A protein has these predicted regions:
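A short N-terminal beta-strand-loop micro-motif at the entrance of redox/enzyme domains
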Residues: 3, 15-46
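Short, glycine/polar-rich helix-capping loops at beta-to-alpha or helix-loop-helix junctions
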Residues: 107, 185-193, 210, 267-272
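Short amphipathic alpha-helix with an adjacent loop that forms part of the alpha/beta core around
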Residues: 209-219
Length: 348
């Protein structure tokens, strides 16, 4: 490892956004590097994961209840991290150890070891533990296989098809013998989905005739729809769902910055009638709370698929902790291409 710097930076939540987050919602603070006490380790963040769920953690406590409490004003922004042990007063950790944790948006963290996962002595791609081999990959795996239950010959439609979850869902779908239709934003992403990820078709949701294109791409209807987006994408999908279709609901990123209900007529009666008449299974899930007990199964199978080249993975590395706020703002607008990871420090 390189010599540790003499400063400790951390991004805290300065204010709660109304609509889209702005740079003013975050504040960068500096202090001395902390010293571990008895039973503690000092972790230096190397990679920080940025994910859409972070927008929900910026909400007010008085907002609609969610599965995790909001970040307090003045507290460090949350986030999964890959770190290295700098110094240790803990019997299970030695300087130089690689660990997966939840240190958040900061250079250093003191930890008692609770919740840390060792990544081995010399992991080949340590940041992948935040992506295809971590929470996004696990989310794709369990959501599709346990809730979606794809069968060979079925049509699988995937929203946000080039994001870390959607890209993995589509590739697992191909492994299971599905016809896969991706939905993404822009020609470049759609081309990548087909040429690299192996989707049979990928449609640009920004097209004026997107709904018509989707209907043409799914002449036999939709058997499984993996929901990451919501909004007008779901509106186009709903009438195409087949009887006994399955809809794993992973995210609704199109509405994360919304300040109220969408314009237009109330869509709930149509949704409920469609679910009833077509016996559709639509289920939300929280990966850690619902499937944490199956992490070993996922790690074994996904590791094998990645090693065999059956699952391809794209990472968007951004250098510098100072870039985190703008990177998250861009992520929520769909400006990312692949899994967004902040490289906080050198990984040597």
């Amino acid at each position: 490892m390189t010599d540790q710097p003499q400063r400790h930076r951390r991004w805290v939540l300065a204010s709660r956004p109304h609509g889209e987050p702005t740079a003013e919602n975050f504040r960068l603070e500096e202090s001395e590097v902390p010293t571990p006490g008895p039973g503690q380790v000092l972790l230096r963040t190397v990679f920080l994961s940025l994910d859409p769920y972070m927008r929900g953690r910026m909400r007010r406590m008085s907002d609609a209840p969610s599965y995790s409490p909001p970040v307090a004003i003045g507290a460090v922004m949350v986030g999964g991290t890959v770190s290295r042990v700098v110094s240790s007063n803990h019997a299970d950790y030695q300087p130089g150890d690689w660990v997966l944790g939840y240190s958040g948006w900061q250079d250093y963290e003191l930890s008692d070891g609770n919740g840390l996962v060792k990544l081995g002595d010399d992991p080949q791609h340590p940041s992948w533990s935040l992506g295809v081999l971590g929470m996004p990959g696990f989310t794709a795996y369990m959501g599709l296989l346990d809730i979606g239950q794809p069968k060979a010959g079925e049509t699988l439609v995937v929203a946000a098809a080039t994001g870390p979850v959607g890209a993995t869902v589509g590739q697992i779908g191909k492994i299971k013998g599905c016809r896969t239709v991706g939905i993404a934003g822009g020609a470049e992403k759609c081309r990548y989905a087909v040429e690299t990820l192996g989707f049979d078709v990928c449609l640009d949701h920004r097209a004026d005739d997107f709904a018509e294109q989707l209907a043409q791409a799914c002449p036999q209807g939709i058997d499984v729809y993996y929901e990451n987006v919501g909004g007008k994408v779901f509106d186009a999908v709903l009438p195409l769902l087949n009887t006994a279709a399955r809809v794993p609901v992973c995210g609704l990123v199109s509405g994360y910055n919304a300040t109220g209900l969408p314009d237009g007529p109330d869509r709930l009666p149509l949704l409920m009638a469609t679910i009833l008449k077509k016996r559709i299974r639509m289920q939300g899930f929280i990966i850690g709370q619902d499937y944490g007990h199956r992490i070993a199964e996922f790690q074994q199978q996904m590791g094998r698929w990645v090693q065999e080249g059956k699952i391809k993975y794209r990472e968007q590395l951004i250098d510098g902790l100072e870039q985190a706020p703008q990177a998250l703002i861009g992520l929520l607008k769909g400006e990312n291409f692949g899994k967004v990871v902040i490289r906080v420090a050198a990984d040597d």
